[in-house]
Amino acid sequence: VAFFTSRGMVYVFKLYNLPYTRAGFGEPVQNLFKFADGEKVISMLSLDPAELAAGQTPSSGDSSNKSTRQTRLSFADDNKGGLEGMIIGGSGYGFRFPLSNLIETTRSGRKLMTLKGDDKVVGFSLITGDHLFMASDNGKGIVIPVDQVSLLTGAGMGSRLIKLINSSLAGFKIANKNGHSTLTFDDRKTKKINFKDIRVTNRGGQGIIISKRKKITAVE
C-alpha cells in the first residue's frame, strides 16, 4: 500500500507488516514512518494488481468474486507498467507518473513532488479517465485533457495546470468527458458539476466561474 502526504512524500509499505488488531484504532501511521512536523496523509492506494484494475476493467456480469478477481489480475498483467497516477499541489502545479515507480520505501519515504514555500499537495488520483477537472477555492473551474499533464519519472513540480490568482486549488477529479464532480462549499452545501458543461481548454488557464459567492472547500 502507498501513502501520499501533504509534503509531497510517498511511503510504500507491505500490508502484512502492518500491526494486527481485532479492535481499537490501530497504531498511528506516524509511528510507522518518519513524518516531518505537520505532515499528513492525504491519500492512499492499494498496489494489489486486482485492486488497481478494479476501476478500469469493464464489468463482465459475473457475480463470482473469484472470477472477477481473475479477470482483474489478467487485465493488470496485460497492462503492467501502463497504469499512471497524478499528483497536484495547492499552487496548481502537478504531473502524471507511472505506478511502476511505487516500490517499497524505508521509514523515511521517498520524495515524489517538489514543493515551494508553504505549498502542500492537495491530492493524488489514479488515472481512470481522459479529462481532468480542477476547482480553485475562489470559485473557478477548468477542464483539460489528461494527456496535457506532464509525465515525470522522478521527483519534480510538473507543469502549471491551472492559473491561480489570490487563491489555491481546492481539489480535482479525473473522469471521462461525460463525468461529473461534486463540490463542497464552506457552508457545507454541495453542488454537482458536469464536465460536459465546461468547455475543454489547454492547461494553464484560469478557468470559468462555477461559484460566485461561496468558497469551494472540496472536490469529489
Sequence positions of predicted segments:
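Short, structured "edge-of-domain" segments at secondary-structure transitions
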Residues: 1-220
